[in-house]
Amino acid sequence: MNGSGSQGAENTSQEGGSGGWQPEAVLVPLFFALIFLVGTVGNALVLAVLLRGGQAVSTTNLFILNLGVADLCFILCCVPFQATIYTLDDWVFGSLLCKAVHFLIFLTMHASSFTLAAVSLDRYLAIRYPLHSRELRTPRNALAAIGLIWGLALLFSGPYLSYYRQSQLANLTVCHPAWSAPRRRAMDLCTFVFSYLLPVLVLSLTYARTLRYLWRTVDPVTAGSGSQRAKRKVTRMIIIVAVLFCLCWMPHHALILCVWFGRFPLTRATYALRILSHLVSYANSCVNPIVYALVSKHFRKGFRKICAGLLRPAPRRASGRVSILAPGNHSGSMLEQESTDLTQVSEAAGPLVPPPALPNCTASSRTLDPAC
């Protein structure tokens, strides 16, 4: 984060220089370890559920998959290194990682915010123009949008490759900002505008219009249909994810603005506040799988299937009849049935109710023919 490369070590040494016990040296790594564990397992499960059987085929699924990739990259590539700031006085990972870690932090942050903005537009089109938007909301266009998202993220985070550097300071090896104060202030302001302020404005506008449309155009006939319930449910889930992103990253950006445009003295209280802002912003990368599990029953079922498959031994080879019937239990993706055109009705009427036998099935029909 901004200034986190060396200021953490400097503040730790300044505030804890009396030789007393430093609680942040123990408590902060524990919280980081919890974030790392929950985030790694949760996002890995999300990716496994969406990729299992090629289920990430809808636009919403692809965007959620991309969000999971960004969160997992942040957890694996950034959190372990940032945790050492509060436990070690020195930066021990070398000059290359000093630049790369901070670059990846802002790369994944931009990718997450742009993805949330894109999925908010996707939800608005799916709700407001369900028929006319089908030609636009295709997997191919979603992949193109994801490529554009990462391209923009690289563009806006690229300068951070030179923002930080490793150097010696008072017999310590530190990773600290290398730019002058005016350049850093301009860069931090641009980061706030493009990675937070503009995406939040897009999220607010699209979801406000989506909710307004949903509540003003409730049709008593179609409101209770499986398709409408599914679209409302997945929209609610994405709104929760977007709100959590805004809330989790708000303290970090507010703190940075206070440093540059207000008064932020280096005291024990402000140091604790900076640690808290880091923890809250980092925790955003592990809360999305929890939201999916709480809101989406399809994700819960997918999580249970993945966990059950990991815990139980490999099953024996199934017979031909079982192998044909098995795919029927996975006819829809975990989120696809909730997101666009597929509905929850297919789940209730498909896997649980066997299809009736056709009257013209004869002995010539093979036993493996699913129609018989």
Curated annotation (Swiss-Prot):
It comes from the Eukaryota. It is found in: Cell membrane. The chain crosses the membrane at residues 29-49, 61-81, 100-121, 142-162, 188-208, 238-258, 261-281. Disulfide bonds join 98-175. Residues 50-60, 122-141, 209-237, 282-372 are cytoplasmic. Coiled coil: none annotated. GO terms for biological process: adenylate cyclase-activating G protein-coupled receptor signaling pathway; adenylate cyclase-modulating G protein-coupled receptor signaling pathway; G protein-coupled receptor signaling pathway; galanin-activated signaling pathway; inositol phosphate metabolic process; neuron projection development; neuropeptide signaling pathway; phosphatidylinositol metabolic process. It is a multi-pass membrane protein. SMART domains: 7TM_GPCR_Srsx (SM01381). Residues 1-28, 82-99, 163-187, 259-260 are extracellular. GO terms for molecular function: galanin receptor activity; neuropeptide binding; peptide hormone binding. Glycans are attached at residues 2, 11. It holds the Pfam family 7tm_1. Residues 353-372 are annotated as: Disordered. CDD domains: 7tmA_Gal2_Gal3_R (cd15097). Belongs to the G-protein coupled receptor 1 family. Receptor for the hormone galanin, GALP and spexin-1. The activity of this receptor is mediated by G proteins that activate the phospholipase C/protein kinase C pathway (via G(q)) and that inhibit adenylyl cyclase (via G(i)). This is Galanin receptor type 2. It comes from Rattus norvegicus. The gene is Galr2.
